[in-house]
């Protein structure tokens, strides 16, 4: 027997508790109430699920910033690269990545300073914004709060989103945000058909394109899917759609021009696709298809499995006879199918044989929403399944919290160890024999030095306009790792600089009891000997 003590507030979540009688536990009932609150109720004027997500992101910004400040640690690989490049606004930054994430980092740093706080605001602002846009789009299409919550928390079932994007990755997180914003903008076009809606759709299209270049797959798939449905085709053929096209082109034009004039920088990472590594055309195609299937399973396998198990757990619940899905659901399924087809064609036509799991993000970002919409038509069985998805997504997000805090302080192995270096000590040793305005290294770990001196110029071998960016006095700083140094030596020479004959080795402390306790760094002053040679500007 169970007795309820206290109440349940729809504004502030579960406030009562259950009293144990006859030795029976009530944890399950309490968790079900909490899940229902996340799905259907409000926290003040906001949906409870949205409030949970926003609070989660705020907590992450505060805890990660304060813990790093307390420990004196730096940032990991991807965010140290942002520290290096976000010093200036530019149409492009190299590394085969579009500039939008860096623009946001630059803007935030101009408001709160070049700091860990700035980068965490960008990261978790994008995560919260993307999840909120995703939720809102599903609701605007007429589906239930429960479906919208299941779609939003369903995104957190992807390990690449709930885990990898919290301790690494930058531009992939921009895909989550701006693909969701584009989804919402399309919904607004279909609902309102106003000039403002079409203009915002153009801006959202540009933002999605400038988040990461492989997001063109999502753009193309969503466009073709909209053309394939009678209910959405009319909005695309509306002459006001030209407003969207013009706005998108104008917003992307500076980066498009930069890309065409910096093709070498744009394609600098193209060897990562493993093009034509199979030898013959048939072998290459086989490797490509196998790699694609493996990437699909690694990326989407877990969320699909969780949705399937959640559905099986609700199998005893009643459900009406199956009916064809409404047009919004058809739109999403078709977008996913077209994205898969486009990806397969690119693999076969381009001879791609190597994949990273996160490259599947533009293909499957609409999958949780499509599944949540399907469940909305399944009565009590669908409601139960949606609740399970919300519960699992929320629990996974909370379980990740302490691990993400650990990674923020300790980093990983190999390159990730740069987090634990004492950059204040390194900066003091760099400037012990005179001021330094530019630090050059073979890769972007040295971007962390801008946490100590925001005015410092930090360059690596992939920075465009390398020669023009150097401000004297300049030093070359090389770490005791296995990174090749020949490229940076070549760029220094072409920029008209020579290395001093004196190479100073300094021991940089590693924090938090790391072993070995220090890392060896070689510091060499650079001297101007000639003007930059042809080709040194890029």
Where are these regions (language model features)?
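Aromatic/acidic, Gly/Pro-rich catalytic loop(s) in extracytoplasmic/lumenal soluble domains
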Residues: 6, 467-538
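Short helix- or helix-capping micro-motifs
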Residues: 57, 151-160, 205, 209
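Transmembrane-helix motifs of polytopic, lipid-linked glycan transferases
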Residues: 121-142, 157, 162, 180-185
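Short acidic/glycine- and proline-prone juxtamembrane loop motifs at membrane-interface regions
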Residues: 164-174
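Membrane-interface transmembrane helices that cradle and orient dolichyl/undecaprenyl
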Residues: 182-200, 375
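Transmembrane-lumen/periplasm boundary regions of multi-pass, lipid-linked membrane glycan transferases
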Residues: 219-328
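Hydrophobic/aromatic-rich transmembrane helices and adjacent perimembrane loops
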Residues: 326, 330, 334, 351-386
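Membrane-proximal, lumen/periplasm-facing interface regions of secretory-pathway glyco-
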Residues: 350-357, 379-434, 442-458, 480, ...
């Amino acid at each position: 027997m169970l007795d309820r003590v206290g109440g349940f507030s729809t504004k502030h979540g579960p406030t009562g508790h259950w009293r144990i009688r006859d030795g029976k536990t009530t944890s399950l009932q309490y968790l079900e109430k909490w899940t229902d609150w996340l799905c259907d109720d409000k926290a003040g004027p906001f949906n409870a699920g949205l409030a949970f997500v926003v609070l989660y992101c705020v907590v992450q910004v505060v805890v990660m910033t304060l813990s790093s400040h307390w420990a004196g640690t730096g940032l990991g690989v991807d965010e140290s690269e942002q520290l290096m490049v976000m010093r200036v606004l530019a149409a492009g930054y190299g590394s085969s990545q579009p500039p939008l994430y860096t623009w946001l980092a630059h803007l935030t740093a101009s408001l709160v300073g070049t700091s860990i706080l700035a980068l965490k605001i960008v990261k978790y602002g994008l995560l919260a914004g993307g999840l909120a846009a995703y939720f809102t789009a599903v609701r605007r299409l007429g589906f239930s709060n429960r479906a919208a919550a299941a779609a939003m928390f369903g995104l957190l079932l992807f390990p690449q989103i709930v885990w990898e994007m919290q301790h690494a990755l930058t531009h992939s997180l921009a895909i989550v945000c701006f693909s969701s914003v584009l989804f919402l903008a399309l919904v607004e076009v279909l609902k309102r058909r106003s000039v403002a809606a079409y203009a915002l759709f153009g801006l959202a299209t540009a933002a999605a394109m400038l988040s990461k270049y492989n997001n063109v797959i999502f753009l193309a798939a969503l466009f073709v899917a909209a053309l394939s449905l009678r209910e959405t085709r009319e909005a695309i053929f509306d002459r006001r759609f030209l407003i969207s096209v013009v706005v998108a082109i104008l917003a992307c034009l500076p980066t498009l021009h930069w890309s065409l004039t910096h093709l070498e920088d744009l394609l600098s990472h193209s060897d990562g696709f493993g093009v034509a590594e199979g030898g013959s055309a048939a072998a290459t195609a086989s490797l490509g298809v196998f790699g694609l299937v493996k990437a699909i399973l690694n990326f989407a396998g877990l969320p699909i499995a969780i949705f399937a198990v959640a559905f099986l757990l609700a199998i005893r619940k009643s459900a009406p006879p199956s009916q064809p899905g409404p047009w919004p659901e058809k739109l999403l399924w078709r977008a996913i199918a077209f994205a898969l087809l486009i990806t397969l064609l690119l693999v076969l036509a381009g001879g791609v044989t190597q994949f990273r799991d996160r490259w599947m993000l533009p293909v499957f970002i609409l999958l949780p929403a499509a599944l949540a919409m399907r469940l909305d038509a399944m009565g009590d069985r669908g409601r139960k399944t949606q609740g399970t998805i919300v519960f699992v997504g929320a629990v996974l997000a909370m379980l990740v919290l302490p691990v993400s805090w650990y990674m923020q302080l300790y980093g990983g192995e190999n390159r990730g160890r740069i987090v634990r270096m004492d950059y204040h000590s390194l900066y003091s040793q760099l400037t012990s024999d005179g001021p330094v305005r530019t630090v050059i290294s073979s890769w972007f770990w040295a971007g962390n030095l801008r946490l100590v001196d925001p005015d410092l110029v930090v360059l690596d071998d992939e920075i465009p306009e390398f020669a023009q960016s150097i401000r004297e006095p300049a030093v070359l700083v090389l770490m005791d790792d296995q990174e090749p140094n020949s490229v940076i030596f070549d760029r220094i020479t072409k920029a008209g600089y020579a290395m001093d004959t004196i190479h100073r080795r300094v021991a940089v402390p590693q924090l938090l009891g790391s072993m070995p306790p220090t890392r060896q760094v070689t510091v060499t002053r650079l001297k101007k000997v000639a003007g930059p040679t042809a080709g040194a500007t890029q």
